[in-house]
Amino acid sequence: MSTDSTDRRLRLAAIVLAVVGLGVAAYLTYVHYEGLRPVCGLGGDCEKVQSSEWSKLAGVPVALLGLLAYASILVALLVRREEALIAAALIALVGFGFSAYLTYRELFTIDAICPWCVASATIMTLLALATTARLVRTPRAIEVRYPT
């Protein structure tokens, strides 16, 4: 498989993941602002997670932060510039770290699991992997930002 073909597949996978993540984050943001109970499924406690102190950062719902992150990643992926690839990878890596922290809080502080939140964390993890793989496979992207 050629490098170009692999890059196209990784880019397409990342775009699909960003769109799905955007949908999940949009739903959670909508639920937050409308004051609705999220559809959670068996064994989940979305309402407990959504109403916890960890559901906001500086007064901003983390679902809205996720929405902005997924939208930013999607735009960066659609731009097709090397600097945009660096931006997408950085946003996804920060999102991965923040999602890991929030998942830790779900498990060990809130003592509840929100399947929507876990889905978003999984999507962000896969986005971080896909965008970082593209970045590593494209050495020129690093050279553009940090010339030798």
Q: Which functions belong to the PLM regions below?
A:
Residues 1-148:
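Membrane-interfacial helix-loop segments of redox and metal-homeostasis proteins
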